[in-house]
Amino acid sequence: MTSAKAEATSNFDIALGAVSTFPELGAAWLDLESRSDGSFFQSWNWIGTLIANLPDTVPVEVLSVRHNGTLVGLALLARAELVRHRIVRAENLCLNETGFKNLDVLTPEYNNLLVDRRHTETLPGAVIDWLLHALDGAPGAIPVLPVTDTL
């Protein structure tokens, strides 16, 4: 992932950044997957295939969460502008999807963050709080979020 500073929410350090290298992300994802109870749709088999098949024009970012320096949460976020009711434009952050109908034909079931099983009760709420803080209460706004150098 590239540049900037991570913020701490509760006991977590949360950061958002670009995918640096596919092998690096894969190794981190598989390590966390071994410590989580995620569904197939949070597995590297699913996420890795998704990333490998995305066109270069679809940027995805990696949300990473650390607790005491240990990686305890991962997710892909993509920014997309959607049109609702044919007239309302809304910016969205899509979790483990792109936001483009033609690319998200296979929609994941049981979609969620990949979370270390020791943090399933507290980590998702901390991520939501972090995202809401980054949004700064602006409805419909996509945050310009800080990014980090490492997973």
Regions found by a protein language model. Name each.
Residues 1-151:
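N-acyltransferase acceptor-side catalytic subdomain
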